[in-house]
Design a protein with these regions (language model features):
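Short beta-strand-centered segments that line the small-molecule binding cleft or hinge
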Residues: 1-37, 95, 99-103, 118-123
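Short beta-strand-to-loop elements that line the ligand-binding cleft
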Residues: 15-16, 82-91
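Short secondary-structure boundary segments
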Residues: 16-17, 39, 109-112, 133
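Flexible hinge/capping segments at coil-to-helix
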Residues: 20-59, 144-145
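Residues embedded in well-ordered beta-strands
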Residues: 34-36, 105, 132-136
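Thr-Gly-centered strand-to-loop micro-motif
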Residues: 38, 62-63, 85, 108-109
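Secondary-structure junction motif
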Residues: 44, 58-79, 143-151, 161
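A late-sequence structural motif
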Residues: 121-162
Length: 162
């Protein structure tokens, strides 16, 4: 978002940031959030979990400046509990690595690297949620025709998946 504001980029793929009135956010994809636990964890093997059941365990959590942090905070608020944050991480692959090494459990996007790590991936039964990835652009910025065409292509290609 900062790069858009500084006009370093024409477009960005990101989480939606509230209170960004000068930016258009177009939803282009859904992203699944899951609970990731070490393979030998007592929640492993269950297939799915209520987020409230994760509250007693130390969590590897996204940093405050991550676009996912408010989304995950809101999910925990809906459970009526507060996670025990053991570590804060900016990048999801690093988060997965810490979980694999028994530093805690995590709520994070279901990313391909999880298949290669010593972790178990659990669907979130409750609370319900939807997470979107957005294409962002400045509302008042001139965009080259090729950029406009790319935006239209992304909207048409991914809009069907939403």
């Amino acid at each position: 978002i900062q790069g858009l504001k500084e006009e370093k980029y024409d477009i960005a793929l990101c989480s939606r940031k509230e209170k960004e009135s000068g930016i258009d956010f177009v939803p282009i994809a859904k992203e699944k959030l899951v609970v990731v636990v070490p393979r030998d964890h007592e929640l492993a093997g269950r297939g799915s979990v209520d987020l409230k059941e994760t509250l007693p365990y130390p969590q590897v959590y996204f940093t405050k400046n991550s676009g996912l942090r408010p989304v995950i905070d809101q999910l925990f608020e809906q459970t009526g509990g507060t996670p025990k944050i053991a570590y804060e991480i900016l990048e999801d692959a690093s988060m997965a690595g810490l979980v694999a090494e028994n530093f805690g459990i995590a709520v994070m996007p279901e990313i391909p690297i999880l298949k290669n790590l010593n972790v178990d991936v659990l669907d979130i039964e409750n609370p319900p949620y939807e997470r979107y990835i957005y294409l962002a652009k400045l509302k008042e910025k001139y965009l080259a025709p090729v950029v406009k065409e790319f935006i239209e292509y992304v909207k048409e290609s991914n809009g069907k998946a939403l």
